[in-house]
Structure formats: C-alpha cells, structure tokens
Amino acid sequence: MADRAEMFSLSTFHSLSPPGCRPPQDISLEEFDDEDLSEITDDCGLGLSYDSDHCEKDSLSLGRSEQPHPICSFQDDFQEFEMIDDNEEEDDEEEEEEEEEEEDGDRQGKAGGGPGSQALAGDSLIPSPSLEESHKLRPTTLHLTTLGAQDSLNNNNGGFTSAPPSSWQETVLRSPAQEPLKELPAPLLPAEEERHEVQSLARPGCDCEGNQPPEPPASSGGASPSSDPGIEADLRSHSSGGHEGRRSSQELSSPGSDSEDAGGARLGRMISSISETELELSSDGGSSSGRSSHLTNSIEEASSPASEPEPEPEPLHEPPRRPAFLPVGQDDTNSEYESGSESEPDLSEDADSPWLLSNLVSRMISEGSSPIRCPGQCLSPAPRLPEEAASQANSVPQDCQDPEAGPHVELVDMDTLCGPPPPAPAAPRLGPAQPGPCLFLSNPTRDTITPLWATPGRTARPGRSCSAACSEEEEEDEEEDEEDEEDAEDSVVPPGSRTTGSTAPLDASLVYDAVKYTLVVDEHTQLELVSLRRCAGLGNDSEEDSSCEASEEEAGATLLGSDQVPEDASPDSPDLTFSKKFLNVFVNSTSRSSSTESFGLFSCVVNGEEREQTHRAVFRFIPRHPDELELDVDDPVLVEAEEDDFWFRGFNMRTGERGVFPAFYAHAVPGPAKDLLGSKRSPCWVDRFDVQFLGSVEVPCHQGNGILCAAMQKIATARKLTVHLRPPASCDLEISLRGVKLSLSGGGPEFQRCSHFFQMKNISFCGCHPRNSCYFGFITKHPLLSRFACHVFVSQESMRPVARSVGRAFLEYYQEHLAFACPTEDIYLE
C-alpha cells in the first residue's frame, strides 16, 4: 500500500514542484518543453517523473489513512490515529498545559495579521473556541512551518470515518446552525470508503473576489471526534456576518465545547487575523512554500471526511451572491476553461508556473457550478436529502441541475485514472436525457483540466484545454491527431484525451511484444512492432479511407503511392506549426536547427572537398559587423583558423556562410578519425542504399520496440502536415564499420553538398516494421549527453537489407572494439 502511495506522489506531484526544487542530477526530458515526448512515453508505458528531493515530498504529502481512497489523499509513511481516543485518560494531566498554549495562541493570533506573522509556529496559532476545554495534540509528520498548512489540515480520520457528506454546493449554502451535531456512525468498511464522496472547500480567509469577510458571529456545535479547531476557524471564516449571503461550509467544533459569547468574540478576532495571514501567504508571489501549503490545504480539505451537520434551507428572500468567475455552463462559450491560451495572460503567475493546478482548483471551487468526474469510472454518489436539494436550487444555475440528483464532486487520483477501475461498484451510467457539464482532470504529465460536454448521442471530446504547458501549436497538432486517428477503423484514443464511453479492448496487433532487435544478436531476429496503420498513420484521412482498407502486405505501396503522400515529403516547412522534435536533421537556410542535429557529425563539400564539422555552436550569436558569422544553437561549424584574441574563423555548414565568431560560442566535437587511430585496419566494405528520410524525434530510452514504434507513429503523424508542400529528403545511406552516413542526393544546392554521420559506437538500436518492411529506424545516443534520438526512413522496397547491414557492421565493430579495448593477454598477465 505504501508503494502505491509513493508511486502516486512521484508521478503526480513531480509536475507540481517548481524547477528550482529539483536536484541538479534530475535530467528529465520535461526540460525539452515538448508534449510529443510525453505522448511517446505514455504510449510505451514509461514515465518521465524522477524522484524529487525530500523536502518536496514532505511538503506535498497529504492524506493520513490506511485505506487509499479514490481521491487525492496519499502519504509517505502511514500512521495510526487510534491513539487520539485511546489515550483519553491522559487528558486531565495535560489540561493545564493545553490551556497555556491556547492562551499563547490567542495572543499571537490577535497580532498575526501582518506579514510578519508568517514566521510564527503553526501549533501556537491554532485557535480554540474555549479556554476551559482541552484539545490533544494530533500526531503528524508534516512539520510545515508556514501558517497555511496547519490551519486547515485534518488528518484525524484514521478511526472515525463519518457518513458520506453531500456535495460541496450544498454545504456552502448551509448556515451556522446552533444545533449540536449528531453522533457519528460506525467506521465505514474499506469498500464503502472507496465510494466515499468528498466535498471541496473554498480557500480560507477570503472570498473568491479576494475580499476579506467581516468577523463572523460566534457559533459552536456538539462534540465531534474528527473535528479540529483549525478547520473550524477556516470554515467559519467563510460565513459573512453583515450580508448573510454566504453560509459556512461546515459546522465543526472541538470536543466538549459549549456556546460562549466571550469565547466566540475572541475566536472571531483570531479568525480575522489568521485569515489575513493566509491571504498574505497565498498572494505572495515569491513564497513557494506558502503556495505549497495552500495547495496542500485545498486538497487535504477536499479529501478529509468530516461530520455533517443538519441542513438548514437558505431563506428565499436573500439575493444570490454574484460569482467572481464565469460559471461553467453547457452553452457558456466564454468559460475560462475553454479559453485556452486566451486566458493565459490573465493568470496571476507565469504561464509555466507549476501552481496553475492550485489556481484552477480554487476557481473551480469558488464557482460552484461544475463537478470533477472521472468518465467511465465514476463512483457511486451519496444519498441526497430533499432539504439539501431545495437549498441547492437557490444558487446552482438551472442548466446545470439534474432533475434526479444534483451535481457532486469527486476527486479521483491519477492511479484511478490510469489504472484499472477500483473494486467498488460503479454508479449507473447516465442516460442521454441527463446531460451535464463535467470537468475532467486529464493527462497528468501536463496538468491539463479539460471540459467534456457530454451531449446526447455523441462521445464527449475535449475542447481547448486550459493548460500552461500546452501551446497553440501543440494543441493544433493534438486536435489534428485526434481527428485523424478517430477516422481510422482500428484507431486508439490518443494519450492526451479520454472518452466517457467504455474504450474498446486493444486487438492482438496493438500489444507490444517483448522481442527486441538489438544490434548484437542474430541478424535474422526481427522487431515486433504494432500495426502500420497506427504506427504510420499516413492514410487515416477521411477522404482516403480506401487506402486504409488495403491489406497489410500492400500497405506500404498503397500509402506511399496515394495522392496525399507523394514520393516527396519533408517535415521542416517553416510555414506550418509543429513540434521542433520533428524537424529534419538536414536543415536549410529557411528553418532553424533541430535539437536532434547534435546527435551526429555534419559534413559538406567545401571548395570541392568533403569536410566534416569540427565544432558545434552552443549559443546563439547575432553578428553586429559584416565579417561576423551568425550562429544558432547546434549549428555545425567548420573552424578554419583560430585567432589570438579568442575568435574563430569558420564556416557555418547550415547557412553556408563564412565569418568570425567568439571561440566560447562553439565547442569541439569528437571526430571519428580520433576514434579509429587505434584500429588495426580500415573499413573493408561499405553498403549504400537509396532511401527517403522521414525525420528524427528525441526518445527517452536507448532501445525498445515500443520506443521505436512510438517514434515512427509521431514522425508519420507529423509528416501529414507537410507532405503536400515539400519533397522528401531522398538520401543515400552509407553503412560501414565507422558508422552510418546520410548523404542527401537531391532537393537543392544545399542538400547536394551536405551529409550527416552517426558513429557506430553511438548507435544502440535498430529495426524495421515486421508487417511492412518499408519502414526502418535506428536509435542513436548523443556523443556527450544522456540523450537519445530515433531516425526513421522509408523506401519503396523492403528495408530488411538495411537492417541486416547495420547489424553486421555493428557486430564486426563490436568484436574489433573488444579485441582492441579488452585484449585477452591482459587477463593472463594479471
């Protein structure tokens, strides 16, 4: 159970941690700022989340329960909370000590309204309704020093699980009733806890408009084992004393508390100061710990079961409170959840801020109009009361109401979204006559919250996603991929979207086989990949369905011979927007260099002689004089002369220009000639093949049939955007013991004199498609960094001879390298 919680904490909240908190050795591929790589890892079942530092784990640990709920509650070390009630006989011994601490907390809470109160300890600032009562310190391992973490954490739910509370729309409308709370029922079973519906509470201390409410009237209820004075302070701070338009979301009090006017007035002053402190913490842009605590509070309040008071209907004469944000309705086109990039400038933080999820949760909670629901895996709703439904009808819009049961909130963790359904029985599926807006927490790698409008007779599809990690270009590519793959007969839903209906099981051809074609095994071993229709995706357009229905044996010729895929295709068109990972490694003067160009050595013909690059640009250099050379990152540079003033005179192989540039703007690359100095003989054979280059994409692993398949799929999908504009990069593959050389043979004067070389020692994996051998790819490692790229080729004929040639070259190179690097004589000498 602890392993599951640990895995969820690493996979979900790694994206919520700020980049500055990650260790320097964390070189996750999220730094490349590309969603396509995350889709590749989602397809292959890999994860890009790495282990975060211990401070980050402690600050993000939330729940304290033995049984994992289908909500956002998890922890690193589970604790037992029966000790709270087992040690009740020790209350009399610590009563005097508790009263002194509460008096200190009362004095500090009055003076804690300024920003200077952030440094105060959280334990001393917890208010209590009465000075005569004693509240035992709860066991916790959070040790958060900020104020916002201790005010609203309720982790005393180990042995006292309350009845399933109603939805948060109802509890917001409740008034602070003076009635004592009912006695709690017996603890729920683990199966019932799986169906336990939780409520989401708004941000403590201020309303959704940022205004601080006036001091609330003092009120207290009966005893509740799971109550906490800190939560009571936060919950009571939501009630408005002057307008009475807002009701407290929950009525909680400490054990043995009575209604006292003096204690209530003192509590109101403490709540006011604590609210100001929390508002200062949550609005501070430079305090990352405050944001972490606030996010922890929001999710912890939503995940902590609490006692449920008697509902009291809201008077009808009170005007409804105007929300600060637009509600999410079925016909509301101006909703912020659909605005996408238009709403990004309105965010209070940076577009790449990892705390965007906290902002969205706060907005969603404050609006009170759209529930979070997991499509296809919804949990059973809690029973509804007629009084609660009547009180809910006063504030919920009419288009969002359900005639049978009103909206409810369900927070589902990422393990529930990605894994199999929980053993708890699922709720009955809503029919076509019960449409309603649902917010779907989708794609955990991007922190995207996408609205799904479940319309009758149509499977809900995500619209514009309000995510800071997705740009307009990537959203267009994602929508294009979804449209193309849904038109195919055996298509699979892309990783970035999920449907509300039940997903059809994958057929046998889409299951990844464990057989791998590594370069050191027998040359007859083949690579088992998925079907070409999903992998290539070149014929998935609706107007070309006839080419999709071709047989698997004729799929390669049909796809390459169709009108939509001429024999010339290239991914590097500057007019269209797509990911930089799909840019051709052979770039011309109209497009920028791709990040995969540094994986090999560039060479071109200079003054009638083929020269290889000697340096690689590591910074961008903009010339300010006529004799200076423009450089971009990863540009291949041939240094012809080194000046004394730390300036180089060289030739930019990408642009074909000469000039001078600072010496520190380029780094030397290891050439293949240096590696072959110890070789006893020169390469005796060279195989040449005429193929077409499709593109390169960066991958997270150096081998794997799933990695190669996903790379082919992404490259082929990106090719559909540019197949009508540019001819393909027709190239000659020269395979030898030195490596693989890609020489361009057509397309322009730049292409005729340029080539790319990958050293054999950096090639780690290769293979062709078993059902359509016209597709071939190999994975190379960066010469200096721990980065990998996959290069995909296509041909009119079978590419199996290319795979056998690469395997043969690698086998001979490996044997020769072992004989040179590890001679057997040294073993006997020692």
UniProtKB/Swiss-Prot annotation:
Feature: compositional bias, Acidic residues: 77-105, 333-352, 471-490, 541-555
Pfam family name, one: PID
Residues bearing PTM Phosphoserine: S257, S304, S307
GO molecular function list: kinesin binding; MAP-kinase scaffold activity; protein kinase activator activity; protein kinase binding; protein-containing complex binding
This protein's name: C-Jun-amino-terminal kinase-interacting protein 2
Chain positions covered by the region annotation JNK-binding domain (JBD): 111-278
Organism: Mus musculus
Residue segments, region Necessary for interaction with FGF13: 242-504
Tissue expr: Highly expressed in brain. Expressed in all neurons. Also expressed in testis, primarily in the epididymal epidermis.
Domain PID: 683-819
Quaternary structure note: Forms homo- or heterooligomeric complexes. Binds specific components of the JNK signaling pathway namely JNK1, JNK2, JNK3, MAP2K7, MAP3K10, MAP3K11, MAP3K12 and MAPK13. Also binds the proline-rich domain-containing splice variant of apolipoprotein E receptor 2 (ApoER2). Binds the TPR motif-containing C-terminal of kinesin light chain. Binds the cytoplasmic tails of LRP1 and LRP2 (Megalin). Interacts with DCLK2. Interacts with FGF13; enables the interaction with MAPK13 and may regulate the MAPK8IP2 scaffolding activity. Interacts with TIAM1 and TIAM2. Interacts with SH3RF2.
Biased composition (Low complexity): 176-190, 218-227, 271-307, 427-437
Main subcellular location of this protein, as a coarse class: cytoplasm
Entry's Gene Ontology cellular component terms: cytoplasm; neuronal cell body; postsynaptic density; protein-containing complex
Composition-biased stretches (Polar residues): 142-172
Residue ranges, compositional bias (Basic and acidic residues): 233-249
Biological process annotations from GO: behavioral fear response; dendrite morphogenesis; JNK cascade; MAPK cascade; mating behavior; modulation of excitatory postsynaptic potential; negative regulation of apoptotic signaling pathway; nonassociative learning
Entry's localization field: Cytoplasm
Region Disordered: start-end pairs: 1-26, 44-354, 367-438, 452-504, 539-574
Protein family (similarity comment): Belongs to the JIP scaffold family.
